[in-house]
């Protein structure tokens, strides 16, 4: 899998602000003067290999997203689709848009390889060097994800207390998770409705190997208010990395 790649980016954005302590979607919270979702889009929209970005949003947030998207200048088309009750349902809905785009692209250029990059819209600080490497690995193998080595000591709760877990070869999954379109579509068709912790797990169930690409720990997911303060500090310290 080493022909020219065309990347479609899917961003599930239909979540709530419950854990963030907000009455509205946390993705509308501002980081350095812009909503979180826009930072996530900015990491992708100026890349030469990205062809479209698909946001899966809730019905209640759709009009607000449309207003904010209309107010920005985007280098690639940004599509909105109605998300589902779960992350998997939202990604599945976005895949339908991606499949239509891929069919049109294949008709125009049969040599183009379509990749799908699934990225948490609440991860505003993914580095371009990490994107380069995970996209290249997915183009080569069909499935690759960013992941960070576990650095702290892991404990497993037991009936008698706890035990230490060997952290060697243990990673925390990040996003984006990047797949050849046929690989991720097969995974979703096979496991429609089944729970999974992430998209890579669905692909693993098809017996297709998923490659790990070591990514920066700066690529944190904004879940709690304190995460936003950490992201602000990272952005101020390493601004040139996130242009």
Curated annotation (Swiss-Prot):
GO terms for biological process: isopentenyl diphosphate biosynthetic process, methylerythritol 4-phosphate pathway. The record marks 167, 221 as: Positions MEP for the nucleophilic attack. The record marks 19, 26 as: Transition state stabilizer. InterPro entries: IspD, IspD/TarI, IspD/TarI_cytidylyltransf_bact, Nucleotide-diphossugar_trans. CDD domains: CDP-ME_synthetase (cd02516). Its EC number is 2.7.7.60. Keywords: Isoprene biosynthesis, Nucleotidyltransferase, Transferase. It catalyses: 2-C-methyl-D-erythritol 4-phosphate + CTP + H(+) = 4-CDP-2-C-methyl-D-erythritol + diphosphate. The keyword DNA repair does not apply. One of its GO terms (molecular function) is 2-C-methyl-D-erythritol 4-phosphate cytidylyltransferase activity. Pathway: Isoprenoid biosynthesis; isopentenyl diphosphate biosynthesis via DXP pathway; isopentenyl diphosphate from 1-deoxy-D-xylulose 5-phosphate: step 2/6. It is an enzyme of class 2 (transferase). The keyword Coiled coil does not apply. Belongs to the IspD/TarI cytidylyltransferase family. IspD subfamily. HAMAP family: IspD (MF_00108). Catalyzes the formation of 4-diphosphocytidyl-2-C-methyl-D-erythritol from CTP and 2-C-methyl-D-erythritol 4-phosphate (MEP). This is 2-C-methyl-D-erythritol 4-phosphate cytidylyltransferase. It comes from Rhodopirellula baltica (strain DSM 10527 / NCIMB 13988 / SH1).
